[in-house]
């Protein structure tokens, strides 16, 4: 079990690193090509304000999330808050996706995106459990 606790910070960093990469790619996609990104979901942007809103709502927020999560990679003491942040963001996004599927119907695009969201949510929860366990183990074995 000691081995697991020793490698937990690196496993959780891997999880946070994956989230950082995903949030960055999503953010950059919508900031650099909001019209193309929206068109892939059959959304048309009919004005400059609509394009800017797409850049901000779908690009800037995920990029901001990426920066927050990346900053949590730098210190072992910030791993758990980063994992909680990630679980919260992905959990809310997954819940909204499920709500959309229930209310609006199971569009293939929505179902396709649900899989990686659920996987990322599961990874973040596993990360929270591992890091919490590591901290508990550390407290009981150093006191």
Model-derived features with residue positions:
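Cytosolic juxtamembrane helix and N-cap/initiation of the first transmembrane helix
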Residues: 1-22
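Non-cytosolic membrane-interface motifs at loop->transmembrane helix junctions
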Residues: 106-117
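Juxtamembrane helix-break-helix junctions at the cytosolic face
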Residues: 67-81
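Membrane-water interface at the C-terminal end of transmembrane alpha helices
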Residues: 120-139, 143
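Core segments of alpha-helical transmembrane spans in multipass integral membrane proteins
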Residues: 51-71, 88, 92
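Hydrophobic transmembrane helix segments
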Residues: 22-52
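Aromatic-anchored segments of alpha-helical transmembrane domains
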Residues: 25, 89-99
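Alpha-helical transmembrane segments of multi-pass membrane proteins, especially transporters
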Residues: 85-89, 113
């Amino acid at each position: 079990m000691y081995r697991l606790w020793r490698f937990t910070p690196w496993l959780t960093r891997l999880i946070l690193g994956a989230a950082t990469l995903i949030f960055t790619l999503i953010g950059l996609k919508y900031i650099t090509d909001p019209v193309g990104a929206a068109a892939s979901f059959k959304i048309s942007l009919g004005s400059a304000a609509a394009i800017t809103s797409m850049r901000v709502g779908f690009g800037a927020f995920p990029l901001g999330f990426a920066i927050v999560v990346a900053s949590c990679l730098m210190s072992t003491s910030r791993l758990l808050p980063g994992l909680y942040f990630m679980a919260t963001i992905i959990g809310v996004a997954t819940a909204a996706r499920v709500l959309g599927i229930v209310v609006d119907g199971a569009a293939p695009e929505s179902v396709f995106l649900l899989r990686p969201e659920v996987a990322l949510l599961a990874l973040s929860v596993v990360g929270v459990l591992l890091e919490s366990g590591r901290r508990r183990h550390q407290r009981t074995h150093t006191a």
